[in-house]
């Protein structure tokens, strides 16, 4: 919800000031991460945004800058998946997630976000998914 006259964006959980919103890959089979990034771009393109009002945390001023930071976070997460996959080889979502979130395992949230990144990379041709013995295994292409 955006009040263009006042430059105030009710960003809810979509853009948060200090944490990245959870992107779940569980759903209708679409590329959840690609969809989320596309909507972030729409928010960044809103003219004259002065203030973001999030569902969590304090109001914040640099909405386009925060959008850029969230997008960078997801790029960094995919780069980390490339690194982890190169050392593990083909692995399950759970195995990859535990490597990416080693200090504090966030359980299902971490796994569903890892799944969203992996599925995005599969659809972009940057990773492969296969089934072996009833388990989905992912292998991410090394950085080019």
What are these regions (language model features)?
Residues 1-78:
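Metallo-beta-lactamase
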Residues 80-144:
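C-terminal regulatory/interaction regions
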